[in-house]
Amino acid sequence: MALTQERKNEIINQFKIHETDTGSPEVQVAILTEQINNLNDHLRVHRKDHHSRRGLLKMVGRRRNLLTYLRNKDINRYRELINKLGLRR
């Protein structure tokens, strides 16, 4: 299921750095994580949905690249984000 605008705004408000922040790596990773979790739930029910699985893999790769960028840019922000999202890195 697609991410609703209300849920996206909640995520942005939770992870934003400044008042008009919508594109920081933290916000992007948080939104991608929510989408990945929703798609994982979908794929548990619809195991043969290979088109959605490919989209999931693309999202995971994009999130991985953003996390690598953030880790290289500011390790403290990276660690804080990982703890907030509950990612196992």
UniProtKB/Swiss-Prot annotation:
Matching Gene3D superfamilies: 6.10.250.3130, S15/NS1, RNA-binding
Organism: Anoxybacillus flavithermus (strain DSM 21510 / WK1)
Pfam families on file: Ribosomal_S15 (PF00312)
Family of this protein: Belongs to the universal ribosomal protein uS15 family.
Name of the encoding gene: rpsO
Record's GO cellular component terms: cytosolic small ribosomal subunit
Alphabetized GO MF terms: rRNA binding; structural constituent of ribosome
GO biological process, one term: translation
Quaternary organization: Part of the 30S ribosomal subunit. Forms a bridge to the 50S subunit in the 70S ribosome, contacting the 23S rRNA.
UniProt name for this protein: Small ribosomal subunit protein uS15
Record's function text: One of the primary rRNA binding proteins, it binds directly to 16S rRNA where it helps nucleate assembly of the platform of the 30S subunit by binding and bridging several RNA helices of the 16S rRNA. Forms an intersubunit bridge (bridge B4) with the 23S rRNA of the 50S subunit in the ribosome.
Keywords: Ribonucleoprotein, Ribosomal protein, RNA-binding, rRNA-binding
SMART domains noted in UniProt: Ribosomal_S15 (SM01387)
NCBIfam families: S15_bact (TIGR00952)
